[in-house]
Amino acid sequence: MERPDFFEFKNGEKAKLPFSSEEYNKRVNKLRSVMDTNNLDMVILTSMHNIAYYTGFIYCSFGRPYGCVVTKDKIVTISANIDASQPWRRSHCNNVIYTDWKRDNFLRAIVSIIGRDDPPKTIGIENDHVTLDIKEKLNSIFSIAIFKDISKHLMKQRMIKSDEEISIIKNGARIADLGAEEIVKHIKPGQSELEIAIAGRDKMEREIAKSYPDAEYMDTW
């Protein structure tokens, strides 16, 4: 029986993401500008927020590492086998799935994306997120590489909002107002805080689903 360290699985169709392909491409191009400025051959993203920002995929770790490799001509998410092809469907880029048959298959998947012929000499990582364990192993694998922290560069990029982001922020504020109004309606003597919170949350969740029918919601997958 073959037990692969990693593989690709493109099942289903690409899903509609929160932002357009043009928006994600602009973000990745800006990231590559940061790479050029800082002489980076590769970036390894590990945080949920940055992977979501540049690819559209939001992971749920449950103790497993997730990542995204960005080079001058590639962008690939790396996900655990438990998610199957969901990360591919819910991102605008390619995806590699690593298995649990061997320890550190996550790292083998990274190497598979960039190959062994021309190892990167400078690698950008998120020092405010990457674990000590992963960082030590990256140092061991890419022994000749210099690692640079790019977390602040990424944060500055995220701070400047596009028109598409502003639209979602405004809609989010509108939906939050609806939730607050529903909470006020349910505040009565003897009513539990839990039931009041449920009323506000349910109102917002239903409005979010109505406003974004193509999105994927908690406990629905």
Feature locations, PLM:
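A composition/biophysics-driven feature that prefers long, compositionally simple stretches
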Residues: 1-179
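Active-site cores enriched in adjacent His and Asp/Glu residues with nearby glycine-rich loops
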Residues: 19, 34-51, 130, 177-221
